[in-house]
Every structure is written in C-alpha cells, then in structure tokens.
Swiss-Prot record:
Pfam families: DapB_C, DapB_N. GO terms for cellular component: cytosol. Catalyzes the conversion of 4-hydroxy-tetrahydrodipicolinate (HTPA) to tetrahydrodipicolinate. It is an enzyme of class 1 (oxidoreductase). Its EC number is 1.17.1.8. Signal peptide: none annotated. This is 4-hydroxy-tetrahydrodipicolinate reductase.
C-alpha cells in the first residue's frame, strides 16, 4: 500500500483528497496535516471528510508524522509548499504538488529538489485538462499566426490567484507551440482605449464568482470561423483522483520533476 499524507487536510481540497485516497485501491491515508492554529488539530481525518473514523488524526506538524508516509500531496500555498518541499527533500519523501501561484524563481526551487526526490508538479491534475493541453498544442501548431488567441477562465469567489495556474499553463503550451515567450506576449485584461489587437499577443480574462469549480476556454479566432477548446470541472474530485493517481505512479520512480503529461504518457 502506498502511504499517503495530505497537507491542508482540513480545507475544501484537503477533504476531497482524503476521500479520493480512501477510495483508491493500493493507496491509504496514513497522515493528515493542517496549520498549527487550526481548531481541528487532533480530529479524525476521516470524520473531517465525512467518511467516518479511519484512525488518522489531524496533525499540526509534518515533522511529527515523518515516519508515517511515503508521499505528500500538497495543494496549499506557495510559501507552505516550499517549506514542505525542503522537508521532503531532506527526508527523502516523494511529493505531489498541486499548489499554484509560484514565481519563476520558486519553480526553479522545485526543479532543484527534483534532483533528489521524485515530484509530480502540475497546475491541474484533471485527466481532461491534460488531454486539453495536448489538443491545444496541436491546434496552435496547425493554426499558427492566422488566429487571435484568448484564454478565459472562471473559478469560485474564494480563489486567491489570477489568472489560474491552469490558464497560465494553457498559455505556456500555446506560446511554446508558436515559438513565443508567454511573459512577453501575455495580456492580462483590457480597459480603456487599447488600440487594435496585436495578433502575436495571448489574452487572458478572469472571472471569480460563486462556487464555480473551474472552467477554462481557449479561443482561436480567425476571419469567418473560430475554434474553442473548453474544459469544465463540476467537482474537485476530478483533481483529487488525478493527484492520487500520480502518487501511485511515482512509486519506484527515480528523482525528477514530472508532470501529469508524464503520468498519463501523453508526451
């Protein structure tokens, strides 16, 4: 059995991850961690996820459960994830990282840690989203510079980063396929007298409202026709199941920084 720890276990995504682990053959939740000031520390992780008691108590310190897991799943905040990354690197623990909002420099730290431990880092662990990335690469290469490209994403009102990590990853895939640098061609929102659109740019539009789990559309607009590639998530479980799948896939892997394209053999 693959022994899995969940960081941020008392949060919305954390509870979904607990449920996904418990539903997956070959995986077992052996540790659950949340922030030290959480009033839920000491509670049964199964009860937090409405599964009933499973005998795993919520801890407030990763070090306290260091001997109880093989791989840590972390969907939290960059500052928290980087601290956990240093711990896992020191103690030889594999990691699944679904945290978004990293800077370029922080992503380099993930790559450095990948020299010592196996890591799967992805902006989105959904199988559908990762298939969409493959389709986006194909579409961008075929349509080339003959279309305007816009990325529209929507999430729930509690999401703290914008654009979403998934939207940015979609932009990176499209830009790479076209031989462009996303940092140079991205346009984040428009207002006022913007002038005519530069076809070389890739636009981003963000919606934050209600309880939207995650919608992403990439629009390729030409004269007389347009192509839209859309993915809509209706439950966080799709991300959680993908993360657990990645955790099982990492078993026995050499150190390295992998992503879901590797897990799904889409390369």
């Amino acid at each position: 059995m693959r022994r899995i720890a969940v960081m941020g276990a008392a949060g919305r995504m954390g509870k979904t991850l607990i449920e996904a682990v418990q539903q997956t053959s070959g995986a077992g939740l052996t540790a659950a961690i949340d922030r030290p000031d959480s009033s839920l520390v000491g509670a049964d992780a199964g009860e937090l996820a409405a599964l009933g008691r499973i005998g795993v108590l919520l801890s407030d310190d990763l070090a306290k459960v260091a001997d109880e897991f093989d791989v840590l799943i972390d969907f939290t905040h960059p500052s928290v994830t980087l601290k956990n990354l240093a711990f896992c690197r020191k103690h030889g623990k594999a990691m699944i990282i679904g945290t978004t909002g990293f800077t370029v420099e922080e992503k380099q730290l993930l790559a450095e840690a990948g020299k010592d431990i196996p890591i799967v880092f992805a902006a989105n662990f959904s199988v559908g989203v990762n298939l969409s990335l493959k389709l986006l690469d194909m579409a961008a290469r075929v349509l080339g510079d003959d279309v305007d490209i816009e990325i529209i994403e929507a999430h729930h009102r509690h999401k703290v980063d914008a654009p979403s990590g998934t939207a940015l990853r979609m932009g990176e895939v499209v830009a790479n396929a076209l031989g462009r640098d996303l940092q140079e061609v991205a346009v984040y929102g428009r207002e006022g007298q913007t002038g005519a659109r530069d076809r070389k740019t890739i636009g981003f539009a963000t919606v934050r409202a209600g309880d939207v789990v995650g919608d992403h559309t990439v629009l390729f607009a030409a004269e007389g026709e347009r192509l839209e590639i859309t993915h809509k998530a209706s439950s966080r479980m799709t991300f959680a199941k993908g993360a657990v799948r990645a955790a099982l896939w990492l078993d026995g892997r050499e150190p390295g920084l992998y992503d879901m394209q590797d897990v799904l053999e889409l390369r």
